[in-house]
Amino acid sequence: MKYIYELESVKVHRLSLVDKFYMEWIKSLIDFYFYGQKEEAVARLEKILSQLSVPDLTYLQVSNTLFNFYYDIEDLESFNEIREKLEYQVNQLNLKTIEELNLSIKFNYNVCRYLWLQNNTEEAITKITDTIKQCKTYRTTYLLADLYLLMGNVSKNFSSKVAVKEYFETAYFLYKLEGNMSMALKIEHYIADITE
């Protein structure tokens, strides 16, 4: 991503306004994850958001990234504030395009993950179940393997080994279907640990 950004940034003066926002968004991801310049990345995304209109899909995608950044830098006040706004806005989407559907699933997955990390097990299970149902309703496998993996992780401390193994096996099957052998092998390791 860094390499592609560097190639494209040379042409930034010829880009449309939306494409310039997109380039700034990519730069924020690179700064945050590659260079560790987290505060600068957050400030850049906040600036981008101030220049976009709220219902715009780019606004929601950038907000979703900022949502993740706030959690990662442990700014939980801003995290919860943006979560409420994003949850409302994502729920208003018509889900008539792949981009809208994927954004909805991605945001819901992120919420599920953070609920799990905060040990809010019951709410995490409800949200994961609802998001899996959404994937099935719209016949998409986007993040479905990740959702089943997350359900296995959420339930492994209290659910039966058989149930947890089923979640992991479903995730394993979906990762193999996607050709994601790295994750499939990791899941295979989890399954082996459960059966021992």
Feature-to-residue mapping (PLM):
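Residue signature of alpha-solenoid helical repeat architecture, marking inter-repeat boundaries
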Residues: 16-20, 57-60, 98-102, 142, ...
